Amino acid sequence: MSTETATAEIIDRQTMEVDLACVGFGPATGGFLTTLVNAWNENPADPAFESRVAPGMPLQVLCYERADDLAAGVSGVVTKGKGIRATFPELNPAEIPMAVDVKKEQIFYLLDPIGASKRSGLLRMGDAALKMLGPVLGVKDAAYELPWAPGFLHKNGGLVMSIGQFNQWVGSNLMSSGLVQIWPSMPVSEPLFEGTSVTGIRLADQGVDKQGNPSDGFMAGMDVKAALTVVGDGPVGQIGRALDQKFGTAAKHREWALGMKFLIELPEDTELEAGTVWHTFGFPEPEIFGFLYVHPDRLCSVGVFVPSWMGEPSRTAYRYLQHYIQHPLLWKHLQNGTLRSWGAKSLEESGKHGEPILSGNGFARIGEGSGSTNMLTGSGVDEAWVTGTQLRAGQPFTEENLKNSYEKRRRASWVEKGASEAIDARTGFHKGFIPGLIGMALAGLTGGKLALKGHIPTASEQIKKAHAATIASVSPEKAGDVALA
C-alpha cells in the first residue's frame, strides 16, 4: 500500500448527501441543469422533484467545477446552435457577452509563405500550380478562398460565442432559479464506488504537498453521496478517467488534439465585422486546421488545432500558433491588435470511436468525454449541450433505467446520427494530408456511407513515432538526452 493511499484512508472526512452531484460545468452540464430547471419551473409540485435526502424540499442539486470562475475558458467557438436554440427558442445573442450570429463564413487554403512546412511532393506541385494561376483564381495574401464548400462544413445561421462567457450566462440563470448550486474552485478527486455502482464523489484535499500528504492549512475533501453522479468533466477529466479505469475504454479511444488560441482586440479601423468566421488549412503545417472568429466589440478568437496524427512534430503548439497568426492573410488584420488572453484545450478526436460506457448504476456521462464530438463537421459544443438535455430526471438511477431513458434518447437523436456518419471521416489522415481530405469529402458527401478506413495507430505507436522523429531532428550528441517516458 502506498503512503498516499494509507494517508487517505486514515483521514476523517465529512459526508454530505445530495440527490444529484455534477462534475464539471461546461455546455453538457449546462444543458442538463437547464433542462432540469425548466421542467421544475413548469411543474414544481411533481413528486419527481422532491428530494430523497431532504423530504419536503426540492431536489438537492450541486455542481462542482475545478476552474476558479465559470467564465475562465477563453475558447472561441462557432456552432450551428441547433440544440442551444431548441432550449432557448427566443434566444437573442446580444444577451450573451461576446455572442453574435454568424454573418459571413469563408474557407481558405493557406500557402506556405516562408517555405518551412513539411509538404509532400504532390502538395508542392499543387501549390506551384496555384501560384502560377493566382491572378486567374484570385490567390491573394498567399491564400486561396474555396469558391464552394460542402454543406457539412457550413455554420451559416449559427452562433459565434465565447465558451467561458456562455457558461457564465447559463450558470447565472441556473443559480437564480434556486434549485441548483454551482461551486467553482472545487475540484473533484475521485468517484466513490460500492462494487460497480457509483455512490458519489470525493472533493479534492486542500493544503497538501507534492506527494498528496497533508501540510500547512490542510483541509480534507468532503465525500458527497448522491443518487446520481453526472460526469461532464471534458475529454481528460479526473472522474471520467477514473470511470474508464474502472469500466474500461472503447477499443479505438486513441486520438487527441490540442487547441491553442489567442483572444485579440482588433484595431479600431479593422475591416472584419462581428460574425465573421474563417476556417483555414494548409499552414503552418498541412495537417493543422486554423480558425478566426470575430466577436462583438472588435474581439477576435484566432487559433489552431494540432492533431494527434502529426507523427513528426517539429514545434510546440504555441510556436505553431505564433507562425499561424503571422500568415499574410491574418497578419494584416491582427498586427496592430492587442492580445487580451490566451489558452489551450485538449480535444477528443476519436468521436464515436471513443465513446465510453455512457451510464451505469448511479452515474451517467455527458458531453465531449462521452464521445459526442462530430469530427466531420468539427463541432462539439452544441452536441455536448444536447447530450445534457437528453439526460432528464428518472428515478431510481439504475443502469437499466438510464439505458432505457438517457441512452435510448441519445441513440435516436441527430447527435448520434452525425457522430455515426463521422466515425471514419478523419481516419485517412493517418495515411497523409491528401488522403485525409479525400476521406473527409467522401464521408461528408455520402453521409458516412463511404470513407477511407484503416488502422488507427495506438497511443504508444504514435508516441514512438514522434519520439523517433524527434531523435532524427537533433544532433547525434544530443540524441541521448531525449528520453522516451
Which residues does each predicted region cover?
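Beta1/beta-strand and adjacent pyrophosphate-binding region of the FAD-binding site
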Residues: I10-A28, L62
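Glycine-rich Rossmann-fold phosphate-binding loop(s) that bind the pyrophosphate
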Residues: F25-P27, R66, I163
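N-terminal FAD cofactor-binding segment of flavoenzymes
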Residues: T35-A39, N43-D46, A54-P135, S413, ...
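Predominantly flavin-linked oxidoreductase catalytic cores and closely associated redox partners
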Residues: T35-N38, R52-M57, M161-W169, N173-L330
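Active-site-proximal substrate-binding core of FAD-dependent oxidoreductases
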Residues: A54-P58, G371, M375-T377, Q390-F433
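Helix-loop-beta segment of a Rossmann-like dinucleotide-binding subdomain
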Residues: V136-N167, S172, F305-P307
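FAD/FMN-dependent oxidoreductases across multiple families
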Residues: M310-T387, Q395-S405, R409
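C-terminal auxiliary extensions adjacent to catalytic cores
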Residues: I423-A485
